[in-house]
Amino acid sequence: MTVLAAERLRYRLGERLILDDVSFSVRPGDNIALLGANGAGKSTLLRILLGLLRPAAGQVTLAGQPLQQLSRRDIARQLAYVPQSHVPSFPFSVTHIVAQGRLPTTGLGHVADGADAESVERALVELGIGHLRHRPYTELSGGERQRVLIARAMVQRARLIILDEPVTGLDYGHQLRLLALLERLAAQGLSIVSSTHRPEHALACANRVLVLHEGRLLADGPPHAVITCDLLLRLYDVHVRQVEADGHCFFVPC
């Protein structure tokens, strides 16, 4: 079963071709790292997958239905999004922000109670932000806000979560905990697509990596098979060597 499919996507910005003939599908349990250098087209691709940009050619289907034919609410019931940054308009509490994840299902005016309230509480604890539940979102650090948005996505109960550079602003410990959480969610059958320019994040938790280079899909496969010294030289113009320890793969500068 395919959760989402991108079919021969092309996108132009003026005379510049940003994406060219990009095709792939997302299945239940996929934990996909979208890897590429700055300017490779990752953010543009995510915005097309979310229905925020219309491709010049090709289409995206969500559960077999063309994305452009679905309402924003229908999309939100199936797809959750965690942006790289979020500037709130009002000083809502952390609990209020997380509970907003239920809006696509419950609608406006619904107060989270019963099972919904339990979902919010579980997400707060899972992300290690239970102590922030009554704090205004506007007073949080960038890393704390990121964890709140991920908790909101979990509460949304969508089949697919798309994250734009999810470890941005997180300290080392919270980076590792977040990557482990994404791995657990995929093991439960959710689909994850997260963009990154850091190959170590793809190696740490993803079970599949899509490599985007100059607007084209360069590779699609298991991280340890796809990410090589030659690939990193092509993507980032750096010479590295591969080191293995305790069954894990690392790349260090030559």
Regions found by a protein language model. Name each.
Residues A99, G114-L132:
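Conserved ABC ATPase "signature" region
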Residues L50:
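Helix-to-loop junction immediately C-terminal to a conserved catalytic motif
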Residues G58-P66, I75:
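Conserved ABC transporter NBD signature motif
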Residues P136-L140, E144:
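Conserved ABC ATPase signature
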Residues I161-E165:
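Catalytic Walker B motif of ABC-type/P-loop ATPase nucleotide-binding domains
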Residues L235-C254:
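ABC ATPase nucleotide-binding domains
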Residues L35-A37:
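The feature captures the beta-strand-to-loop junction immediately N-terminal to the Walker
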